[in-house]
Every structure is written in C-alpha cells, then in structure tokens.
Amino acid sequence: MAWGLPCHQNTAGANPHLFLGCYSTSSLQGLEYGGQRGDAHGKPGVLHGELEPHDHTSRLERHDLHSQLPTSVQVRHHWWEGALDLAKKRQQQTSINVFTTIKQGSRCDRWMVLGAISLLYNQEEAPDDRPLRARREVRSQHLSWAFPGTAGPGLVCAGDSQ
C-alpha cells in the first residue's frame, strides 16, 4: 500500500527535513498549535476550514496522514547519521514501514531514500528477513534489492517492501 503523497526532491543543494509521507516542517507545525497553519503562499494563521480551494484536497490528505504518523518521525537528508540517531531515540516508531510512505513511481532524492532505509533497518525491532543486508547495502548505496523498479540514481520506483 502506498499513501500516494509526492516526494519533494532536493534540487537546491539545501539540507531540508523530510517527514515520512513527504511533509514539510511548516505544514505540520500548525497542527500542534490549535489547528492554525499557513496557506499555500506562506501566510500564517489560516485555519484548516479556510484553505484555498485549489489546496484543500492535498491539505486534507496531509492531515489524515498526520493522524497516523507523529511529527517526531523525521529523517534528515544529510547523509544518514540523522536517521540513525533518531532511530535510537524513537524506539516507539520501530513498527512503521517507511517504504509505504514513498509513492510508487515517484522521483525521490537518493539521500531521502537512504535515510528512510536506515531509519527502518537500524532499529532494534527491524524486520528479521534481511536487516544485516540492508545495513550493508545502505552503506554501499545499492538500492536494487529494495526497489525492483530502480532505473538509475535519480529515479526510484518505490512500492511495498512486502
């Protein structure tokens, strides 16, 4: 199963944060403070019911996903030490399958995928089918075992890992 939310590709060379389901930090922040949030143009203080029509569906989808995944599930793009550190601190997130948060056929940043894999496989309760192989292949950056549709380093076709 894939939630179908698009992945944000890092093309500016910056170091953004990635929430599972491809949230941005700003889109989640408002939900923690009484439901106020910015609109599509960055204007603060817009309530969920007052969103612009062209953005309403996507915001509803994000809100639904937010109810399933806490905001603490976060993968940093900078290599994958951030994801490893997070996995050690957030043991309650060990049951989440990160592969279901990447839309099938999406164009994803390579480090986003590596970070998601490391978040899943560097936890105490990682799946027992191939956690050691996953850790080794994350380091060598070979993703073909996890993503059968991989066409190249810039295009990842991610579906279920099951």
From Swiss-Prot:
Full protein name: Uncharacterized protein UMODL1-AS1
Lineage, opening ranks: Eukaryota, Metazoa, Chordata, Craniata, Vertebrata
Gene designation: UMODL1-AS1
